[in-house]
């Protein structure tokens, strides 16, 4: 509907509209930028074919690198222009302290978010992943968001970036050089952190 410039009718499976005329029109044409989060290789061709931005959240760098490379390969395969960094986004949990030592101690509060348990239906709602993958997750039952990796493993994998301002900047540059992302999102609050610790 957002890309149609004239009134139209819609005869869908569940809804029927004899006359639809979206107004006001989106300012950005043909539509605002679309970001798709994904960690499944099955979704990458669909995202790349539409030239949407691919975002990975709390994903190890090696997995994100594989996904971004699949996107780039799909673009080459289809003859699309080489995707620039603006087509890739990455989110990590980031904690910056006055010193590396202090940041390492205070930043461990981020583990609450990474290790907390929650109902599986919130993690994999219907329509987000292929049915076969969803079935595997449901059969496994509720569990932590991620396996209980150690603090050091989470940092080595890139899910957590923690340290002094200089250390965090160095790791952010490493992330950019390795993954070629144009959007680096930082989650810097979780669980029991105080307001001061999140500033």
Regions found by a protein language model. Name each.
Residues 26-33:
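A local structural motif
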Residues 58-61, 186-197:
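Glycine-rich, proline-tolerant flexible connector loops at the mouths of alpha/beta enzymes
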Residues 34-37, 52-56, 86-93, 175, ...:
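Hydrophobic faces of well-ordered beta-strands that scaffold small-molecule active sites
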Residues 12-13, 39, 186-189:
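Short, well-ordered beta-to-alpha junction loops that form the rim of enzyme active sites
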Residues 39-63, 67-68, 72:
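A conserved active-site cap/scaffold subdomain adjacent to cofactor or substrate pockets
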Residues 1-25, 62-181:
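An alpha-helical appendage that flanks or caps ligand/catalytic pockets
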